[in-house]
Swiss-Prot record:
The gene is nifC. Pfam families: BPD_transp_1. May be involved in molybdenum transport. InterPro entries: MetI-like, MetI-like_sf, ModB_ABC, NifC_ABC_porter. GO terms for biological process: nitrogen fixation. One of its GO terms (cellular component) is plasma membrane. Keywords: Cell membrane, Membrane, Molybdenum, Nitrogen fixation, Transmembrane, Transmembrane helix, Transport. Belongs to the binding-protein-dependent transport system permease family. CysTW subfamily. This is Probable transport system permease protein NifC.
Amino acid sequence: MENNKKILESSKKLSSYGDGESRFSFLEKILAPLFLALTAIYFVMLIFPIISMIRYSGGSHIIQTLYDQDNIKTIILSFVTSLIALIFTFIIGTPTAFCINFVRNKVLSKILDIFVEIPVVLPPAVAGIALLLAFGKNGVVGNFLSNHGINVIFTSTAVIIAQFFVSSALYVRVLRDSVKSVPIELFEVSYVLGAGKIETIIKIMIPMLKKSIVSGLILAWIRSLGEFGATLMFAGNIIGKTRTIPLQIYTYMQDDIKMATAFATILYIMTFVLLLLVRLSIRDDD
């Protein structure tokens, strides 16, 4: 209702501009080409560096990259750790997104939203330091684990934790926004029919929002695959153990830029394909 009122008010304002039609027509002739030019500049700035990278890497180097044993280990490690992080993201992030929406206290709800947003905007190095201090031997969690003979830092587990920390928020945000768009009447009808909140979520909401769930998970997976700073600070750069694709690119940049760009091209292609799946999923949902 509020959106409809805003649309009507905007329409009235536009209709009141009839006297200045010639003035706005003149401005449109100037601004329309300017907008197109700025849009073209924006996409050139986005696309040209990527084209340059692909041209520089060359097809032979990309193929050579895929035959290197260390690179194969890196790719396998990246996929395994990111998929495990994705499973935890779904298991933990799904109820979290619903619980945030069910919080009645607006202040508490906003505070929880801020905590969800922080990993998205936090510099990766800061996230790495925070995880290092929390899970280190002197940290609260790390000290407890150390007393039980469990070491997390500089292990594959640390990679999974870092990937989960930086990527899960994307999934929670997508699902939270989708839940907010569901009419409140749907919940009320479900309650009247005798279903509880959990039953409503499992039997009605999750099947209804499956496209949003898939899209959010793919976005989180992309973020996990591209995670660099927090992983480097928290898990290190150990081949076959903690060296993911971004860390392998970082390592190659020190002495073999051709291989670095070839690996970067592979990561770009993977990201593009996954984002394309997200777009197709959203289009099908619409």
